[in-house]
Design a protein with these regions (language model features):
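Transmembrane alpha-helices and their membrane-interface boundaries in multi-pass membrane transporters
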Residues: 380, 397-411, 432-452, 459-501, ...
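Extracytoplasmic/periplasmic membrane-proximal domains and adjacent transmembrane bundles
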Residues: 6, 119, 165-345, 408, ...
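Solvent-exposed, membrane-proximal periplasmic/extracellular interface segments of envelope transport
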Residues: 22, 58-134, 192-213, 232-234, ...
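Hydrophobic transmembrane alpha-helices and their membrane-interface caps
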Residues: 24-31, 345-413, 871-958, 963-982, ...
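Solvent-exposed, non-transmembrane alpha-helical starts
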Residues: 16, 55-62, 99-110, 140-144, ...
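Transmembrane helices with small-residue packing motifs
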Residues: 12, 19-54, 116-123, 450-459, ...
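Signature of alpha-helical transmembrane segments and their immediate interfacial
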Residues: 1-34, 430-432, 500-551, 596, ...
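Helix-loop junctions and hydrophobic alpha-helical segments within the transmembrane domains
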Residues: 322, 329, 333, 408, ...
Length: 1019
């Protein structure tokens, strides 16, 4: 008993299968997790080390170099990039793509152990060594707290209260606060007063530094009981600090700290990072979601919790959403579900009109059940509903009906020939089940490189393959089981759907016209082939005019403005300038909100957002508009106005993008040892970019050289006075800004103690040599000019960038996002000119940016592509037990580029990475249709028919299933044409498949006749 006969006769089992698919599909759809975009693992960690007082060169040589050397010993490392600046080393470590998210924690632990083992050998002045391995955490809910009448301490207190409540919500991963300013105790010590009392500042500094150190005092056994010893004297109030006793040197009197110092409580004066939201100082609360949760449901819980806490919110504090991933996901998924429903409706309507009511209902029901079954498998394998998985379903829709169309078509033909329903169903399923399986596996295999790619782009797009795999395989199962069952229920024997003539179902005018055209093509077979080759050559030439793109801009109406002040600018000056720029942007029309992050980037609120490192001269504005159309209008206005309005900073305007994307579209990396040579080469590269009218935001990552003040230390004089270089440095630090010495523990809060001179005694550059410094030899203060032989002004490299342990200066640029130009076009124009530059020995130029990202993504695909195509060819050989016959349909695969090239040019769509995936998938669709036709030719030949007539009759009999399969796929793509992410892929598949239908129905028969030497029948 065949599977079709079994399905028809065992109606209870078939109905049970339908009920399981329907109920299970609906239930699974409701249970599926929801995301805006699929998760992909950011395989990066950051090592941050501080080395106060060290120059960028000293940081590079004494701190960055040994850290990089030790990290590089790990076998998992892909690349290491670092930034060495004054007193700070920032090292980004990227893992190889071979390692998945489950392996990363162990790798980070191993790296942490290596760095900890190295720490004792690092310079003594290295104060902190931090390893951030949650660099890829995404804070999908970002809240901004503002309040005109509240200071940072009060805002932070309320933020802490909210954090404690939000952390308890089911589905919340972690909650972090950013933008808060450290509260400090300022101890202002009068140097004049110390000199009068003959007190050494270092004595006070030492006391403050040691008084609150937590040190074990041991334990003692008392009557068999072990008691801990806890000496009192810990400073935990300002009063206790004021009453700290200092021993006077000359008089022997006990002097309290308040006798020589004024102690106040306040906010750090030089912040690391400041946030603004709509012009107000802000604190950010970032909430990340736990893995695998339904983001929309957790977002609703967060909203409900915040609403319940509204009553305890202090009056005057405002809380606003900066980013609400739950809402974004809900909107995105709803839009895609609507697109999916539209696509299903389009396919079913087409089937009803072209196949007849009953046939259309059968295939439509099978399509819906296949989609429901796909939801069940997605739920089982933890594939969430998001842009990629839903897009995959829409892409698959047209292909999902292919197998069912072939089966229904065969049943209809059998009925026209007088067979019973069960005979017709059994015959067609027996005849086509294995060719259809082979064709389905080939279609799935065409998408396999996406699923097997291990780079970030492959991980991002991977669910596309798995959803297509599930749905296409299910479409084969339902085609050979449920389709015969439903046909037996709904079709009538002796059905007249196909034609009025029962003896020949292909007497219709469409079939007759096609048959005549095919006979002409077979008669002039070499002219037909020559014409196709000419079209292919023309398409390849035309493809050079198609715009190239990696990933398109996001649908979210948000963009970024990066502002760079001249290097060396104090962050307080950057704050002042950022406030003016933020106010200017906020005055523009159609603004939803403007936020600013000064000193570094925001917390990562989306996977594709790359936070900037710490730079005092940097600020980023995040601008959200009312809709996407007005965003581009505003971008155009700001692009022309910002530079004219503000002369000090430079600006870079960036759009949010789908998928992983580089910081800049064009990156020319210049590697070599000498900074001066690197800068000279950078000037030449920048000159080339400046000559191209399409280049924007041209700069390099070493920034401008900065000035430094160099007191010339006389070591011999200083030694006689008992003064070291460290004494001079600490005294100057105290005189100009102050030093953090010690901590005061106030409950759970730890307040750093900042020791500095009163404002009236702080010196400026001109009076540097008059700074008073304590001489241990003289036991008194002396002016610094006794140990300094003048002061000079020098230049230094503020930032030393390295890549894989080599100094690397990167020239950065972007294309004009408001024009028709693309990054790939700009790269194609400037790359040959840059590579033609004379490069000194020991230096090289390599390329990053979008070029590298695209190349890496394509290499990830091409790694498995040869094996995939080999498997596809082997399957076609096994299906036909021949080597020559598969060549017939494989010849048509490269010809699909004809439709793709002219389709993209006609619609002015770019050839993006998604379009590239669409091009790969076309091969599977073309082969699938070709197999159906070639299998029919074999059947006709096996029945003893004349070869020439067998070719014509087979092609005519396959016109409807092949053209219907193509038509449903093409029309089902319509909702994706208007999607920013899938638009170019949709056009690629629609245009390519439309032309491929001609290839299948005309070129395959012609090539078969040529390869097998078949001539027209003499009759």
């Amino acid at each position: 008993m065949s599977i079709a006969e079994y399905s028809i006769k065992n109606k209870v089992i078939s109905w049970l299968f339908i009920v399981i698919l329907a109920i299970g599909g609906v239930t699974s759809f409701l249970e599926l997790g929801r995301l805006e975009d699929p998760a992909f693992t950011i395989k990066d960690a950051m090592v941050i080390a501080t080395y106060p007082g060290a120059t960028s060169k000293e940081v590079e040589e004494e701190l960055t170099y040994p850290l990089e050397k030790e990290i590089r010993k790990l076998p998992y490392i892909d690349k290491i990039t670092s930034t060495s600046s004054n007193g700070l080393s920032q090292i980004m470590v990227s893992m190889k793509m071979d390692y998945g998210p489950d392996e990363l924690p162990q790798i980070w632990d191993e790296m942490r152990r290596k760095i900890n083992d190295l720490q004792p050998s690092l310079p003594q002045g290295v104060q902190s060594l931090q390893i951030i391995d949650d660099f890829g955490d995404v804070y999908g809910v970002m809240l901004m707290l503002t309040g005109d009448d509240y200071n940072y301490v009060e805002l932070k207190r309320y933020a802490d209260q909210l954090t404690r409540e939000l952390e308890l919500i089911d589905g919340v991963g972690k909650v972090d606060i950013a933008g808060d300013q450290q509260e400090q105790l300022f101890v202002e010590i009068s140097l004049d007063r110390l000199a009068a009392l003959n007190l050494d500042m270092n004595v006070i500094s030492g006391l403050l530094n040691k008084q609150n150190n937590v040190v074990s005092a041991g334990e003692v056994m008392v009557n068999g009981e072990s008691l801990m010893i806890r000496p009192s004297g810990t400073l935990n109030t300002v009063d206790a600090l004021e009453n700290l006793i200092i021993h006077g040197r000359d008089t022997g009197n006990l002097i309290r700290l308040k006798d020589v110092a004024t102690i106040t409580r306040g906010i750090q004066e030089k912040p690391d990072n400041v946030l603004l939201f709509n012009g107000k100082k802000a604190i950010n609360i970032g909430v990340s979601f736990a893995s695998g949760v339904n983001v929309v449901e957790v977002g609703q819980r967060i909203e409900a919790e915040l609403a319940s806490l509204e009553s305890i919110k202090p009056a005057g504090i405002d809380m606003s959403y900066f980013y609400n991933q739950a809402q974004e996901v809900d909107d995105s998924v709803k839009a895609f579900v609507i697109s999916l429903a539209e696509a299903v409706a389009i396919v079913i309507i087409v089937l009803l009109f072209t196949m007849g009511l009953r046939s259309g209902v059968i295939i439509g029901l099978v399509l819906l059940l296949t989609v429901f079954g796909t939801f069940i498998l997605m739920n089982h394998y933890d594939i969430e509903l998001h842009r990629i998985s839903l897009g995959a379903l829409i892409i698959a829709l047209g292909m999902l009906v292919d197998n069912a169309i072939v089966v229904v078509e065969g049943i209809l033909v059998g009925l026209k020939k007088g067979r019973t329903k069960i005979q017709a169903a059994t015959d067609i399923v027996k005849q086509t089940q294995w060719p259809l399986l082979g064709a389905t596996v080939i279609a799935i295999t065409a998408f396999a490189p996406i699923g097997l790619s291990q780079d970030a782009t492959g991980e991002f797009m991977g669910s596309l393959f798995w959803v297509l795999c599930f749905s296409l395989f299910l479409s084969w199962i339902t085609a050979i089981t449920l389709t015969p069952f439903l046909a037996d229920l709904l079709l009538k024997e002796q059905d007249k759907t196909l034609a009025a003539d029962e003896e020949d179902p292909y007497k219709g005018w469409l079939f007759v016209a096609f048959g005549a055209s095919l006979k002409w093509a077979l008669r002039f077979r070499w002219l037909t082939v020559t014409g196709m080759v000419a079209l292919l050559v023309g398409a390849v030439v035309a493809f050079g005019n198609v715009k190239q793109q990696f990933f398109p801009p996001s649908n979210t109406p948000m963009f970024y403005v990066d502002m760079w002040m001249p290097e060396g600018t104090d962050i307080r000056e950057t704050m002042k300038q950022a406030g003016e720029v933020e106010s200017y942007i906020r005055q523009q029309a159609n603004i939803d909100f403007v936020s600013a992050s000064i000193g570094q980037g925001l917390q990562r609120f989306a996977l594709t957002y790359e936070p900037a490192k710490n730079y005092e001269a940097y600020a980023q504005f995040q601008v959200r508009t009312t809709d996407r159309d007005t965003m581009f209008v505003l971008l155009n206005e700001l692009d022309s106005r910002l530079a004219k309005t503000f002369d000090k900073p430079t600006f870079q305007l960036k759009l949010m993008e789908f998928g992983p994307s580089p910081a800049s579209k064009i990156e020319a990396r210049i590697t070599g040892p000498d900074p001066q040579v690197l800068r000279a080469l950078a000037v030449q590269v920048e000159d080339i970019l400046h000559t191209d009218p399409g280049a924007r935001n041209i700069r390099h990552d070493w920034r401008e050289r900065t000035k430094q003040i160099v007191p010339i230390f006389n070591e011999s004089k200083a030694r006689r006075l008992g003064i070291s270089k460290e004494d001079l440095s600490s005294t100057l630090q105290m005189s100009f800004g102050g030093s953090t010495l010690g901590l005061l523990r106030d409950g759970t809060h730890i307040l750093p103690i900042m020791v500095r001179l009163p404002e009236t005694e702080r010196v400026d550059f001109e009076s540097l040599q008059n700074v008073s410094i304590w001489s241990p030899s003289l036991q008194s203060y002396i002016p610094a000019d006794q140990i300094i032989d003048g002061v000079t002004l020098d230049w230094e490299e503020p930032l030393i960038q390295r890549r894989d342990r080599k100094r690397t200066l990167t020239v950065l640029a972007d294309h004009d996002v408001l024009s028709e130009d693309t990054a790939a076009s700009l790269f194609a124009r400037v790359q040959p000119k840059v590579m033609a530059l004379p490069i000194p020995h020991g230096y090289e130029i390599t390329w990053g940016g979008e070029y590298e990202s695209s190349k890496d993504a394509q290499e990830g695909l091409f790694g498995s592509l040869p094996m995939g195509y080999l498997l596809m060819f082997i399957i076609t050989m096994l299906l036909f037990n021949s080597f020559k016959k598969p060549l017939v349909i494989w010849f048509t695969v490269p010809l699909s580029i004809i439709g793709v090239a002219f389709g993209l040019l006609a619609t002015n769509m770019p050839f993006s990475f998604t379009a590239f995936l669409g091009l790969l998938s076309l091969s599977g669709m073309i082969l699938k249709n070709g197999i159906v036709l070639l299998d029919q030719i074999n059947l006709e030949l096996d029945s003893g028919k004349d070869p020439y007539l067998a070719i014509i009759d087979s092609a005519v009999s396959r016109v409807r299933p092949v053209s219907m399969a193509a038509l449903t796929t093409i029309l089902g793509m319509i909702p994706l044409v208007f999607d920013a992410f899938f638009g170019s892929m949709a056009i690629t598949i629609m245009a390519g498949l439309g032309f491929a239908t001609v290839l299948t129905l005309v070129v395959v028969p012609v090539m078969f006749a040529i390869l097998f030497g078949i001539k027209p029948a003499k009759s």
